[in-house]
């Protein structure tokens, strides 16, 4: 269990740093290019899962279609994240995005009439207070973004982590109907051993097809995929072009590594795995952002990020 947990946590934390370095504010479509790279590597791993983990190949096309609503929620949330990180600090966006567990609990309470223990409710309140406060005390960042990008883009940028949180929460909520119980799942022909892998494979192949659609869009827009910038007229060799996109490629590779290991970590580790994955990824990205990206928030923001972390850990422990 610990090997999978450590690999998944580190991989996703490192991926966040490469996302920031690869999604450049001056490169208009960098977030879409990142989406293409992630989809490509996800597609490769999906084929590995499809042929090695006992997924029913005959029924998979039907399960692929059935799982589309969930997969699209997850994928679009990630595109929002890629766009937002072009303009805001990774240290700020990641804790917000990883707070979706609180929103999932609220959705379950409203639509499934689930009840929660007092500590679980307290954890939701802690996360909510932290989220509101960390964005409220982002005055310096707001002013900087407004002066640099304009008021409209500054608002859109800070909204992106919240869009990720919302869409990821909706996807996780819908996932309950697919992967929570093999006897009531909307998927067909799955067992306890294959239900998670079937859903995971459907998500990854959807990401691959989504990335192809994005690539077609970029082609229609006449965007040169490997250009240094949208207006670049310079001629570069193939390997130079690949090297220029190294941060996006590395982000996609580490994202896929995290995706490849987290299911095994969760299946073996239960609640403690959820705590480490949720909190560990944020802590890793915070530390790496400070070291490699030289990001520095105010002490008030770090305080409220710490409060969010406490809420996330409590939520994982008490069953959110």
What are these regions (language model features)?
Residues 46, 107-108, 118-139, 300-319:
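Hydrophobic transmembrane alpha-helices of multi-pass small-molecule transport proteins
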Residues 7-18, 27-76, 126, 197-227, ...:
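Transmembrane alpha-helices of multi-pass small-molecule transport proteins
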